[in-house]
Design a protein with these regions (language model features):
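Pyridoxal 5′-phosphate
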Residues: 1-279
Length: 279
């Protein structure tokens, strides 16, 4: 959401106000209340991720909508879709974005749910498809595949959460100096973002990969960008600790054996990572 907003700042003269978060990664609702009270008549849109794709922290969207009043509220629910209860009606948002690739569907297809009372400018002009918002012949196979993937319901949230809790408990037992980012907030079942003091995430990532364990240093949409996570910086990390963090993801096909294997290699990885950081 940040990149389109920043584009509007650079090219359309818009003003962007980034709402701070707490150390747990939850939106600072008091700040938002003050902002709306002071400048509500100037605000065109409030846009908040339903859950963060790096930490899994779930935002209080319904409360944001209440604070916003008549201001339109958009939520990017791509990460949350099928992973946690998600009701467009109950949240009360103006619009919600979803994507197929997060639920096992094809890349390049998604959905924008928008209240009928609102009209938005066309992204592409032409034949008038997609209610004249996005012209072009509809990709029927991808649409059908998206619907099938969303309906399959193969993701068992309770099972995945049990695996995550097993992983985090084992991790903290073997590496007591590590800490889980967003642990005090409501989180998605399958994401664990961990900081390992005294290490560098790039080194840890290579070591984990050599041990046949897949993890990441941040979101896939920023992969390959060697800079501290803006998410962790917003949560109060300095650049050093932000670059000492890894994201572990568990999915529908993850097993207890996967978790136990990852835990078995972590002590060696952390030890070697700290040694490399001291050179």
């Amino acid at each position: 959401m940040l990149d389109p907003a920043r584009w509007l700042v650079e090219h359309e003269g818009a003003e962007l106000i980034e709402i701070p978060v707490t150390k747990s990664g939850v939106l600072d609702l008091d700040y938002l209340k003050g902002l709306v009270a002071k400048r509500g008549s100037e605000i065109a849109l409030i846009s908040v991720m339903h859950s963060n794709n790096e930490t899994g922290v779930i935002q209080p969207i319904a409360e944001v909508v209440k604070i916003a009043g008549s201001i339109p509220v958009h939520t990017d629910a791509v990460q949350s879709f099928t992973k946690t209860p998600l009701s467009y009606k109950e949240l009360g948002v103006t619009s919600m974005a979803l994507s197929a690739h997060k639920v096992g569907g094809p890349h390049g297809i998604g959905a924008l749910i928008l209240q009928r009372a609102y009209e938005i400018p066309a992204l592409l002009h032409g034949g008038g498809q997609e209610r004249e918002i996005r012209s072009g012949t509809l990709n029927a196979p991808a649409i059908v595949a998206f619907a099938a993937a969303a309906a399959s319901k193969i993701y068992e949230a309770s099972k995945v959460q049990e695996l995550r809790e097993r992983f985090e408990a084992g991790l903290l037992s073997s590496a007591p100096s590590a800490y889980i980012n967003g642990v005090d907030a409501k989180r998605l079942p399958g994401i664990s973002n961990v900081t390992f003091p005294g290490t560098q995430s790039d080194s840890l990532l290579l070591l984990m990969d050599s041990m046949k364990v897949s993890c990441s240093t941040g979101a896939a949409c920023s992969a390959g960008v060697h800079r501290p996570s803006h998410v962790l910086l917003a949560m109060g990390h300095d650049e050093v600790s932000a670059q000492s963090s890894l994201r572990f993801s568990l999915g529908a096909n993850s097993t207890q054996a996967d978790v136990d294997f990852a835990l078995s290699v972590l002590p060696t990885v952390i030890e070697r990572g700290r040694a490399a950081n001291q050179k």
